[in-house]
Structures are given as structure tokens and as C-alpha cells.
Amino acid sequence: MSALRSHRYNGFKHRERSGNAWVTVLVVLGILVLLVVLFMPATRNAREAARRSQCKNNLKQIGLALHNYHDVYKEFPPAYTVDEHGKPLHSWRTLILPFIDQQMLYQRIDLSKPWDDPANAEAFKTVLPVYQCPSVKPEPGMTTYLAVTGDNTCLRPARSLKQVEVTDGTDKTLAVVEVNPKHAVHWMSPNNADLALLLGLSAEKDSLQHTGGYHVLLFDGSVRFLNINLQESILRALVSASGNDEVGEY
């Protein structure tokens, strides 16, 4: 009987130890799950911060290319070129290709024919990372980096502007803006942004690729992050190249 009681006691102790082991495993798993949940937002934030940094660097590279273009041709590129009938042909993004290490691609483009002509099909298929925000996954070749165009902007349709003509100051005048994906265009396309599109971005803040605003390239080559709720008067002043507008703090 003593041996039987001992066997039962040992069996009870074994089950107790097994039960404690499972409790320990479950506690450890619970801690691991909690840690994963706690660190996931931090990981996402770190990834988005890295993507925002790369987006900013893309625009800085574009700004440097615009100024290198100006150094060579003594004027900034037009927003787009036109044919003899005034039909848009090629974007400023195509014109600055030699200044973003894409000389060979530039040479393969027939500038006398439209950007979407079959003669330019090979270039059309080319994806250029410098024209793509890492926070966006657009269709191949699409870009959310659009020039600000209009009658009094720096990049004007079919007309080149010299730096001295930017009388409002290159540090207070927009060159390129980052729009939300629904306004994306092919990088070869002559389509760009205007004041109306910019003013409408505040109503589309939930679809912006960066929380709270968007990047802009100023004509001095600097990149700023504009708050989506920026005052309309400031935005209008930033668009103007020679309107003697007071931009103020932003």
C-alpha cells in the first residue's frame, strides 16, 4: 500500500510540474506577443521615417538637377516643351535626365515626337526610382512629383525662366510638390500641378502618403514639409515667382 501511495504521490507531483511548465510557457508566449504588439508601431514609424527621408532626398536630387540645368543653359527648363502647334511634347522631368545620371536614357528619347509616341516606347517603360516616393506603390513609371505650373510660377509651360526673374526669392518659391497618388502621372508626361490642385490637397489629407502634409522642393534647392492645414494665403505666395508676396513664417 505504501508503494501504491508513493506512486500516486509521484504521479501527482509529475502532473503538477507539467502543469507549472505549461503555465510558464504560456506566460512567456504572452510576454512575447505583448512585446511584438508594443514594438510594431515603433517599427512602422521607423520604416515610414526612413521612407520620408528617402523621399526628401529624391527631391533634393531633383533640385540639384534643376540648378545644374540652369548652369548649363542659363535658364530653368520649361514645365514642358511644345510642338509648332503648341501641343505639349515632353516634361521637365525628361529635360533634366542628363543631370540625374540618365544621359543614355535621354539620348534614346525622340524629343521631336510626343512623350507617349511609339518611338519613345522604350523610355516609357523605364522606371526611375528618383521620381518615386518610397511610401507609394504606383503603377510602373508613375510619379507623384509634379512641378507647380502657371502664369507666374518658376516652371512655366513652353517657357524657360532665368533665376534672376524669380524676384520673390528662390527660397520662397515652389518648384516641385509631392501630390497624393490619385494625381500621379507618368514621369514623361507633360502634366503637372497648378494652384487649384494644391489648394485641394487639404481636402484629401487622408489619402496623402505622409501623415500631416507633403514635401515640396523650393527653387533654392531646399526641401520643406508643408503642413496640410497651411494657410491658403501662404500657399498662394509660395506658388508665385514674382508677385512681391509676403510669405511669412510657415
Question: Where do the protein language model's features map onto the residues?
Answer:
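N-terminal single-pass transmembrane signal-anchor helix
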Residues: 16-47, 51
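Surface-exposed loop/linker segments characteristic of extracytoplasmic
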Residues: 37-39, 48-250
